Amino acid sequence: MRKILYIHGMGGGADSRIPSILQECISNPVVVRTYDFDPEIAAVQIASWVNEVRPALIIAESLGSLHALRLEGLPIIFVSPALNAPYYFRFLSWTTFLPVMTPLLDRIYKPRSGDRQQLHFTFRVLRKYRRHRIEAMKTVRNTSYENQVFAFFGTDDHYRKQGVVSIKTWKKHFGDTFSVYKGTHFMEEEYVRSILVDKVLEVLDNNK
């Protein structure tokens, strides 16, 4: 049976909410694993999982979207793609020279307990996200995404106000291949069970 690889967002992990709901709704196995916050390490991890799992579809949430864009040849569904997060991280990276900032950021963004990505906001790690975005956009320029990508954005996504999540940025690269739901950055269960499940089944059916 064809598998789905789910790439979680910042602080997510193997027990993230959306993939667990998806698995209740569809018969295809949904594979989700916890990757490192360091994007260089994570890129290697995710590439190896793609080779192992051989997914028919990638679903990428929030910060995981940049990792998905570095992959080629697979259809991708995006949930609240945070394509501009590296710009925000660039600013945060300089603040970490203040001794209080790294422990403060670690506390503010501390993930829930469980099998979750461990977050440690150091200058070294945050600065790597600039190169990470460059590599993702390089792949975008060299790849034809016709009928291969689709994104969902929430009307009340607080990261859209900061520009971290941006419909304008999405349209620049992928046109009108998106839909907006009346919800937040973290897609609510009712939308996972309706619009996301419907899109997953549609993409799988179109890519047999």
Regions found by a protein language model. Name each.
Residues M1-K3, E146-N147:
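A short, charged/proline- and glycine-enriched loop
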Residues R2-V53, H185:
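Active-site catalytic motif of lipid deacylating hydrolases and related acyltransferases
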Residues Y6-M10, I59, F152-G154:
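Short hydrophobic segments within beta-strands
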Residues D15, P19, Q23, A68, ...:
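Short, highly selective alpha-helical patches that border small-molecule cofactor pockets
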Residues A56-I59, P75-I77:
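Residue in the alpha/beta-hydrolase core beta-strand immediately N-terminal to the catalytic nucleophile
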Residues I58-A68:
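Gly/Ala-rich beta-loop-alpha elbow adjacent to hydrolase catalytic centers
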Residues L71-E72:
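Aromatic pocket-lining residues of Rossmann-like dinucleotide-binding sites
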Residues P75-I77, P81-N207:
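The alpha/beta-hydrolase serine catalytic core
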